[in-house]
Amino acid sequence: MDGRAAPTPGGTADGARGGAGDGAADAAGGGAVDGVVGGTAAEAVTMGKLAEDLANRKADARGMGGEDLVARQHELGKLTVRERVDVLFDPGTFTETGLLAQAADTPQTQGRRTWADGVVTGTGKIHGRMAALIAYDFTVLAGSMGVHGERKAARMRELAVRHGHPVIYLLDSAGGRVNEAVGAFGGTGDVFREMSQMSGVVPQVGAVLGHCSAGTGYVPALCDFVPMVKGTSSMALAGIHLVRAATGEELTEEDMGGSAVHAKISGVADREAADDADCLRMVREYLSFMPCRYGDPLPVRPVSDPPERRSERLYEIVPANLRKAYDMRGVITELVDDGAFFPIKPDWAKALITGFARFAGRPAGVVASQPLVRAGAISVDEADKAAKFINICDAFDIPLVFLVDVPGFVVGREVEHRGILRHGAKFLHNISCATVPKVTVILRKAYGAGYYVMGGRQYGADYIVGWPTAEISIMGPEGAVNILFRRQLAAAAPGEAREALRKELIGKVRAQIDPYLTAKQALIDDIIDPAETRVHIIKGLEISQGKRITAPARKRGVIPV
C-alpha cells in the first residue's frame, strides 16, 4: 500500500467528502455529471436576472454622458466617441475593455454619469490588422483624465507593446481632472514616460477631434502622426481660462491652438482634416503604411501600376533651365504607384515635401525638394520637418526615397538667430544615423550641405542616380563665380562688359560640375533618362531591400535638438 486511504462507497478516496453531501445534491435535483454539480431552477432564474442587469448597465454605459450632452456634441459638428469608433475600425471588430469603469467618488462626481470614466479603450482591426484605442469622451466630465480612466489607458499601452499593436488616441478632452489630481499630483504623469519609452516600438497616432489642452496636450506632441479637425479641434499647453488668469490675454481656442495654428505655424500637426470622418480616414491611411510594430514586415498591397512604367510627362514638368521653378508634387504623382501620395505636414515648411507612397506595392517615405518655395532652399522648419520624418521611417524600417533639387540651406541673420546650425545639424544627424534603404534621384541642383542631407552619397545612399540636368557642387555656378572671380569682375568695366565676363565664367564653372564628369569619377551610380525614374527607384529599393548596418556600440546618440 502507498499509504493513501481506500475509496469508500458513495464517498471520496480520503473519506473527508461524500456521503450525505452527495446525497443532498442528488435530492435537490442537481445531480453530478463528470464531477460538475448543476444549479437549481431558482438559481437559473437568478442568473438570468443578473445577466439582464448586466446588459442594462452596459446599455446605459454606451449612452455615454446622456442624451443632452450627446446632442450638444452633435450641435458642435462632432461625432460622439462611439460613433468615432465605428468609423475608425473595420465593422464589427472592436472589443471594448473597461466599459463599466466609473470616476472616483468625489463631491464633483456625485449624481453624474461617469461611465467608462470618460475614456473608451479597447482593440479593433484596421484593414484587417489589430490596433489599440484610447479615446476620450467629451460627454463624460468633458473627457477629463481621471484616475480610473488613466488606469485603463495605461493597461492599453502595456498590452499594445506586449501584443504588437499600434496605439491610437482620439483626443477630445479638457485635460487633467483637477478635483482628483489635487493632493495626489505626485502620482500622476506616467502617460508621458510610457509614450516616450514606447516610441519606435509601436506606431502612435494622436487624432485631435476637439479640445486637447493641459494634461492631454503633450499626448499628440509625443505621437508619430497628428491630424486635427478644422474648426472644431484645438491643442495647447494650457486652456484659454488658465492663460487669461496667468497672462491676461484674451484668446479664443482657435486663435491660440486651432488646427490652422498647428498645421501651418507651429508644425505640431501633420494634417488638417475637414471633419471627424475625414480625420479618422487619415488615421486609417497612415497606418496602412506602417508595420504593427518594429520588426514586423511592412504591409505590401497588390498594385496594377507596372513597375516598368515610363513617364515622358516628366520632360514637360521639370524645366531644363535650372532658374525656372516647377511643382515637385507633379513629379511625385508621376513616380508613385497609381499617383497616390500621403503627405505629412504639407502646409508647414513648404520648401520641403515629406510623405508616404508605394513603389511596386511596397511602402516608402519620400523626401523631396519643392522648387516653388524659395527654390527649395532648406530653412529651420524644413530641417525639423525632415528630421522627424526620417526618424519615423528609420524607426519602422520604411525605405527612404529622395528627390533632389536643392540650392542648399537658407543663409542670413534671421536664420542664424533662429538657430539654423542647430536645426540643420538635427537633419544631418538623423540622415547620418538612419540605416534604412535610401534611394536618391538628383533632378537638377544638389548644392552644398543641401546635397548631404538629401540622401547624398556619403550619407548612406544605396542607389544614387541623376538626370542629365543634375549638378552636384559646393554651390551654384553663379555663387562660385561671385566668390572666386570677384576681383576680376570688379576690374571689368561696368555694364555689358562685366555681365559678358560673368556669363563666360559661369559657363566655365558649370562645365566643371557636368553630371557626366561626376559619373566619370564614379561619384554617382548612373545618369538616367528622366522618363525612367520610377523604374530606377523601384530597382534601387529592390537592390537595397536586404540592407544591414551594424552601428558602433553606444548607449544613444546625442541629437542636436
For the regions a language model picked out, list residue spans one by one.
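Ligand-binding clefts of soluble mixed alpha/beta catalytic domains
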Residues: D2-A27, G31-V561
